[in-house]
Amino acid sequence: MGYGNSRSVRFQEDQEVVHGGESGVKLKFKINGTQINNVKMMSKGKFLKAKVLSRVFSEDLERVKTKILDPRGQTIRRWNKIFLIACLVSLFVDPLFFFLPVMRNEACITIGVRLEVVLTLIRSLADAFYIAQILIRFRTAYIAPPSRVFGRGELVIDSRKIAWRYLHKSFWIHLVAALPLPQVLIWIIIPNLRGSPMTNTKNVLRFIIIFQYVPRMFLIFPLSRQIIKATGVVTETAWAGAAYNLMLYMLASHVLGACWYLLAVERQEACWRHACNIEKQICQYRFFECRRLEDPQRNSWFEWSNITTICKPASKFYEFGIFGDAVTSTVTSSKFINKYFYCLWWGLKNLSSLGQNLATSTYAGEILFAIIIATLGLVLFALLIGNMQTYLQSTTMRLEEWRIRRTDTEQWMHHRQLPPELRQAVRKYDQYKWLATRGVDEEALLISLPLDLRRDIKRHLCFDLVRRVPLFDQMDERMLDAICERLKPALCTEGTFLVREGDPVNEMLFIIRGHLDSYTTNGGRTGFFNSCLIGPGDFCGEELLTWALDPRPVVILPSSTRTVKAICEVEAFALKAEDLQFVASQFRRLHTKQLRHKFRFYSHQWRTWAACFIQAAWRRHRKRKYKTELRAKEEFHYRFEAATARLAVNGGKYTRSGSDSGMMSSIQKPVEPDFSSE
């Protein structure tokens, strides 16, 4: 099997290829799939004839210079979607041929020539896609059934085998679907038939269109399955999937409406023929063709006959059944756009109501048509509701899961009798987590992906954020990638305490969005309070870094020297203690002085100690200055008074110095992290 960086392609032996020569001979092929001639024999010095390459893996097909297409390739995927649209257009166009017969007020039937020309052009264009599908299938490889390897299998690229397999499977169905039968019939065959052209047109259209419509309709289902197998779905979005299923339902209404129109025309003509049989002395069937309007015999008969009056549903002369509405509303003689939408509405109405409002006559064909409407409506309506529910639920499924989980949480809090403030905090956290993640479990999603893809996604999400942390801005990309892999998202609502002073620190947080308040009382010391604001790009929990850098690892986690509280909604990435140990081992590769300086500068613990140290030094400086000024004044007084004053000054010095030393002793210097190389 070939790989991305390889210059050669290894192909599996094809059991279906006829081998020439004796066994044990190795055949070599170029990268384009051609055979290297003059292959040396092992011992006999003979030569083999060229061996035809017949199988290849999918990823190697692009390297082989061949016109065979990969059934799982991007080209076939795009063509399948285009052909699916062409099939749907064809299924929409074919029933429109049923609207060709048009009835006129002169009790005659004609053919709509303009509609006939338009439908012929559109149908011919749709037939071209079916012909293209046949040609593409002859050039599309297939998976050899006995050669499946890790669920993929080898592609058979021998054109003769592909053609043989296609001819013995679905070729004939595609051929029947691609034949331009309606065009040939209405333009060539029907005009040359004996008998009534209108009768021939109606009968031929009814049988030929249905005969060719069935295979065209069944081609959609394997094509949809093939698209789903290749891409996972027919449509990329839920609304498109719902529209696709609704379109199939409308297509069924369109077909039923067209059939109802053609049957209504036949029922109207049957009434005329029945009346003509009564008036058989002066009436002939050929009078019902509009090309006979100028016939004197027809004109005299039409003036004498009352056929236009008796062939109406209200006269009770003939049973029109479910087609009486078409005669009463003069649909059969209306313009095409008007009768089409009326028939579409009739089909949709009766398909949705399962034909409950249909009042049929005693004709067996009419009753059978009503049964088909009821059965088809029941099946399609169930499929439509089920499929649309499946597609639409995909957009609201996570929201519904969150609502169920929230209901369970409310029941649990009520069962445990949590106080109102805790309940409100839980509700607030759930709401914020939903708004931030939309119910997607990011960790589970990332874990299911391959390592390389997971690393790239983590890099995209976290790399720039980690780079903004001053502690990491000097690290190389490999080390930053290692950190990004181990970062986990964390969410905090307003008022949440991330860590309290004196509690063990089990994670280090890097802030993405939001602000936190970090303060300390130096272990509860009276009168001592230090506070600072932590924002995006800052971090907290640096005590864990000192613990992780300790060359002598300790199981006990360090205690926090500060209390960190979220003052608004906060998004952050967390490094757990065990992950930080790995990151800490990478820190030792950096320059010690540079990293120590950055760590001290950005650590709030070190900032607090430095502020107290500077404050104590400033106080000592002021005391020394005050002592010098006081000593200069006392030189002008008597020695006794100077000695007394000097003694008083020294006593006050010791008292105040004791206070400064007590302050410094209470603020312990933070432990220095070990950045030395091991």
Swiss-Prot record:
Gene Ontology molecular-function annotations: calmodulin binding; cAMP binding; cGMP binding; voltage-gated potassium channel activity
Pfam families: cNMP_binding, Ion_trans
Annotated Polar residues bias: 656-668
InterPro entries: cNMP-bd_dom, cNMP-bd_dom_sf, Ion_trans_dom, K_chnl_volt-dep_EAG/ELK/ERG, RmlC-like_jellyroll
Region feature Calmodulin-binding, mapped onto this chain: 587-602
Membrane topology: Multi-pass membrane protein
Segments for region (Disordered): 656-678
SUPFAM superfamilies the UniProt entry points to: cAMP-binding domain-like, Voltage-gated potassium channels
GO biological process, one term: response to calcium ion
Cytoplasmic-facing ranges: 1-81, 137-170, 225-245, 386-678
Recorded superkingdom: Eukaryota
Domains: entry comment: The binding of calmodulin to the C-terminus might interfere with cyclic nucleotide binding and thus channel activation.
Main function: Putative cyclic nucleotide-gated ion channel.
Protein name listed in UniProt: Putative cyclic nucleotide-gated ion channel 15
Organism this protein belongs to: Arabidopsis thaliana (Mouse-ear cress)
